[in-house]
């Protein structure tokens, strides 16, 4: 199951209209790197959400370290320093296939292993919660009885069968080939 579906099911959703955009988010976003995989910290509302989640001092430190190391080709330190699942924030996509998703941010579930076990207990189907895209596949949690190893799960998800962009496939069934 995609982490984004679980974010919606658990209420880990932030609405743009419920957020107050602050000075630092407005100004720091101008200096954030932009990539082709989605909306990053160059979106002021997304940066404000990070500030709300981890605090301004940590975001300022992460921004400073990123600015100093970027000229040397070091990337990703902002997300590592901020921690707390900041890389798992998804949303505020102005090019989204869903109009509502343009003003929503989804945050990965806080306790994915427990959530996986609860879903398995209720549905009788072993599940793994993934935050996957065309660049990386992040296994957030799996139920205790999941029949595959972590390596087998990563292998099954390496080409991102749920797709990216407009493909919007929230559930993937993994079964043996033979």
Give residue spans per PLM region.
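N-terminal and secondary-structure boundary signal
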Residues: 1-178
């Amino acid at each position: 199951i995609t982490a984004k579906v679980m974010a919606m099911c658990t209420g880990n959703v932030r609405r743009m209209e419920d957020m107050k955009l602050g000075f630092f988010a407005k100004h720091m976003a101008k200096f954030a790197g932009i990539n082709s995989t989605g909306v990053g910290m160059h979106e002021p509302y997304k940066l404000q959400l990070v500030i709300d989640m981890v605090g301004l001092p940590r975001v300022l430190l992460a921004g400073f370290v990123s600015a100093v190391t970027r000229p040397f080709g070091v990337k990703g330190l902002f997300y590592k320093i901020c921690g707390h699942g900041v890389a798992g924030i998804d949303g505020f996509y102005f090019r989204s296939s869903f109009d509502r998703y343009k003003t929503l941010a989804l945050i990965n579930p806080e306790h994915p292993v427990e959530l996986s076990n609860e879903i398995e207990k209720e549905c009788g189907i072993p599940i793994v919660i993934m935050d996957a895209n065309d660049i990386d596949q992040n296994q957030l949690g799996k139920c205790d009885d999941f029949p595959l190893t972590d390596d087998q799960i990563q292998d099954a998800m390496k080409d991102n069968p749920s797709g990216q962009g407009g493909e919007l496939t929230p559930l993937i069934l993994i079964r043996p080939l033979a």
